[in-house]
Amino acid sequence: LFINGCTLPHPERYRVAHQIEQLISQGLTADSVFYDRLSLDQLKYYRGFVFFRCPITDTVRNFIKQANYFNKTCFFDIDDLVIDQKYTDSIEYVQKMSDEDKHLYNDGVNRMRETLTLCSHAITTTTQLQEELQKYIKGQVLINRNVASDEMISRSNAAIKAVNKNEDKVIIGYFSGSITHNEDFDLVIPSLIK
């Protein structure tokens, strides 16, 4: 069971829906639920649980404790270091937040870290994130990179066939999905201008 703690649609697509598709392709079954709809009754229907960007709540805390009691495995999945203010405080966008917004944002960051530390293992997208997350849990930190779904691949192939190419132009698309990543693209702009 994937427990989604993210309100944005694109992270959920890559880290929940696409991983469910991967599991189904291997003959397994999987479902998802938004974290505020999680119920202790769901413990009896699944052997493993993946908490994606899930902030701690009393229900989440009790659920993980009960899962551990029944020898069921809990993973925390995240594709960004929004689990500790030592990482997020350096982001320009976060620094420019109003005091009220920053307080709310930091509360979410700290609550996600608490869920992370209660889980036995973690799943992330890169080696660098793996190394950082290992500082917070005793179990394994596995890498499962973001991938395109079967539908995305099919649509991309159709779009490639339909496009009229202009050999005199180079078109670059950057789709980070997060305003906090704008600084990342700024790093390559000087090279692109050349």
Region spans (language model):
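A short beta-strand/loop micro-motif in the catalytic core of glycosyltransferases
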Residues: 50, 118-126, 175
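Helix-loop-beta element that forms the nucleotide-linked donor phosphate-binding surface
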Residues: 118, 129-150, 155-157
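A short, well-structured beta->alpha microelement
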Residues: 24-42
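A conserved, positively charged/aromatic
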Residues: 43, 90-97, 113-118
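Membrane-proximal helix-turn-helix segments that form the acceptor-binding/catalytic region
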Residues: 65-69, 99-122
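Conserved catalytic-core segment of nucleotide-activated headgroup transferases in glycan assembly
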Residues: 2-28, 146-194
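Active-site proximal beta-strand in glycosyltransferases
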Residues: 68-97
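Short N-terminal targeting/anchoring amphipathic segment
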Residues: 42-59, 73-77
